A protein has these predicted regions:
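Glycine-rich, proline-tolerant flexible connector loops at the mouths of alpha/beta enzymes
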Residues: 3-4, 32-44
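Radical SAM/AdoMet-radical enzyme domain recognition
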Residues: 17, 21, 25-31, 42-130
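Residue-level preference for long, well-ordered alpha-helices that form the structural scaffold
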Residues: 12, 43, 104-107, 137-141
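Loop/helix-junction capping segments adjacent to catalytic residues or to phosphate/diphosphate-binding pockets
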Residues: 40-41, 70, 135-138
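Canonical Radical SAM [4Fe-4S] cluster-binding loop centered on the CxxxCxxC motif
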Residues: 1-15
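Short, small-residue-rich loop/turn micro-motifs
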Residues: 35, 88-90, 166
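Conserved C-terminal portion of the radical SAM core fold
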Residues: 109-166
Length: 166
């Protein structure tokens, strides 16, 4: 995807406010803010501003963003974010490296440790997901569960969620 030519839209603060207001009128009380993997297109500050706007309308704010450091997760939590989901894709580090040839996403340990940094940054919950099919799905399913289990033991207050691949 690092060479993907698809045009993408990015909302400004006014557009974010308008969308959040419209979505909240449907009765939803939780919102998920998604970005791509580009820090240049969606900076941590931009995501933080979106969280501040969302907090006016929603009780719970989730993020599906690129992995960031603990201080950045703290900032996002202070802006209103409650939980973070990171898709590991596969827990086979050798296979993972063959799938991500360039960019920050290539750094397996940084990505696999994102949920722990989010909890260190004050998030109340984290989500896990493997794509199940890039490697042996049984191994990835087990690794996803074990990853969550280890963090639940270390952070017993944490809310843990699993996302299934589409």
């Amino acid at each position: 995807n690092c060479h993907n030519k698809i045009n993408r839209a990015q909302l400004n603060a006014e557009e974010i406010e308008k969308e959040m207001a419209a979505i909240s009128k449907t009765g939803l009380q939780e919102i998920l803010i998604l970005t791509g993997e580009s820090r240049n297109k969606s900076t941590v500050e931009y995501i933080g501003e979106a969280c501040k706007i969302a907090r006016k309308y929603f009780k719970v704010i989730g993020l599906e963003i690129y992995p960031v450091n603990s201080d950045e997760y703290t900032y996002l939590h202070e802006c209103g974010a409650d939980y973070v989901t990171v898709f590991q894709e596969t827990y086979n580090s050798d296979k993972y490296e063959t799938l991500h040839l360039a960019g920050h996403k290539r750094i397996y340990p940084y990505r696999v440790n994102a949920q722990e940094r989010a909890l260190q940054g004050g998030m109340r919950g984290v989500g896990f997901g493997a794509l199940l099919g890039l490697d042996d799905f049984r191994k990835d399913a087990f690794a996803t569960g074990y990853h969550a289990y280890l963090l639940q033991r270390k952070y017993p207050h944490a809310e843990i969620a699993f996302s299934c691949p589409r």
